[in-house]
């Protein structure tokens, strides 16, 4: 379907109507935020860590290359900025609303899944020894040889949240969604062989991958944690994107489903109006004959 500019369908003219139509979706987003907060507050499962298991958990405890506060900037703010730029170019409130809604769902659903698994699995991080024994002196149960941590409670708690990587899953959820969004907008799969378009689409995924690599380099995660986080984030991003947009390889992949539904409704209204006018003319002709 050819692209048609919708100059009248802006935030000011139709924003409230579109948002109200999806009010239940926004309420679900609020519920996901509450669930995410709860999952971060509760205590994760403290998996058994024997004395002989600490051989692989003695990596140094160090700061994050990418701090926690930077993850929302990478996963949410950056894609949000790109979506807003496209809105100012096209002035399509349907695209703006559905892209933002899809992005937020992608990140929040990923966050809930990630933290739920973290709390349930309780896998120790590679630097767990130094979290558990900051003075370097290990203390173990006489019978089971399980660790008896002397470190700060919050530090030890965080040490049981290795799998999967939250940095990685969030990054792939947000930037994966952005990659799909750009794929549709610049028509990467139009079969014209423009590899430059493909490079643009791969760039967000590369950034997400580098975030994952930094988690292994910082000894905050095992490689399996990063791989699992990437799979979760990218899978959720794909499902959330397809909920609002056609696949990027579709000829209509440049616009949201709501855009094409609006066009169909507009055509039906025009046809109904034309039919009513034709009927009115026929009635007038009949009356004049009489």
Curated annotation (Swiss-Prot):
One GO biological process term: phospholipid metabolic process
GO terms assigned for molecular function: acid phosphatase activity; phosphatidate phosphatase activity
Top-level lineage group: Eukaryota
UniProt keyword annotation of Signal present: no
GO cellular component term, pick one: membrane
Mechanisms controlling activity: PA phosphatase activity not inhibited by N-ethylmaleimide.
Cell compartments where the protein resides: Membrane
Transmembrane segments: 26-46, 69-89, 93-113, 162-182, 193-213, 226-246
Residues carrying a glycan: 142
Topological type in the membrane: Multi-pass membrane protein
InterPro entries: P_Acid_Pase_2/haloperoxi_sf (IPR036938), P_Acid_Pase_2/haloperoxidase (IPR000326), PA_PP_rel (IPR043216)
Keyword Endoplasmic reticulum in annotation: no
Traits of the deletion mutant: No visible phenotype under normal growth conditions, but mutant plants show hypersensitivity to ABA and significant PA accumulation during seed germination.
Tissue: Expressed in roots, stems, leaves, buds, flowers and siliques.
Cited function: May play a general 'housekeeping role' in lipid metabolism. Exhibits both diacylglycerol pyrophosphate (DGPP) phosphatase and phosphatidate (PA) phosphatase activities with no preference for either substrate. May play a role downstream of the ABA signaling pathway during seed germination and in stomatal movement in leaves.
Family: Belongs to the PA-phosphatase related phosphoesterase family.
Identification of the protein by name: Lipid phosphate phosphatase 2
Organism of derivation: Arabidopsis thaliana
Organism placement in taxonomy: Eukaryota, Viridiplantae, Streptophyta, Embryophyta, Tracheophyta
């Amino acid at each position: 379907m050819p692209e048609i500019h919708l100059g009248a369908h802006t935030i000011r003219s139709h924003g409230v109507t579109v948002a109200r139509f999806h009010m239940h979706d926004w309420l679900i987003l609020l519920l996901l935020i509450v669930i995410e907060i709860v999952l971060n507050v509760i205590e994760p499962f403290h998996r058994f860590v024997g004395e002989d298991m600490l051989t692989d958990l003695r990596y140094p405890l160090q700061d994050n290359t990418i701090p926690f506060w930077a993850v929302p900037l990478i996963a949410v703010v950056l894609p949000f900025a790109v979506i807003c730029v496209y809105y100012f170019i096209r002035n399509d409130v349907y695209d703006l609303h559905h892209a933002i809604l899809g992005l937020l769902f992608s990140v929040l659903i990923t966050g809930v899944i990630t933290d739920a698994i973290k709390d349930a699995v309780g896998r120790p991080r590679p630097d767990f020894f130094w979290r558990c024994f900051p003075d370097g002196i290990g203390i173990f149960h006489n019978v089971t040889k399980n660790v008896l941590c002397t470190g700060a409670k919050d530090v030890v708690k965080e040490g049981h949240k290795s799998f999967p990587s939250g940095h990685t899953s969030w990054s792939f959820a947000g930037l994966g969604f952005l990659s799909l969004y750009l794929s549709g907008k610049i028509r990467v799969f139009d079969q014209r062989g423009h590899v430059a378009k493909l490079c643009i689409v791969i760039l967000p995924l590369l950034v997400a991958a580098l975030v994952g690599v930094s988690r292994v380099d910082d000894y905050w995660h095992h490689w399996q944690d990063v791989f699992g986080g990437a799979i979760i984030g990218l899978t959720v991003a794909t499902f959330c994107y397809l909920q609002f947009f056609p696949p990027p390889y579709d000829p209509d992949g440049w616009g949201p489903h709501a855009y094409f539904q609006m066009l169909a409704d507009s055509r039906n209204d025009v046809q109904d109006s034309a039919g009513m006018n034709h009927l009115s003319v026929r009635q007038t002709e009949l009356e004049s004959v009489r």
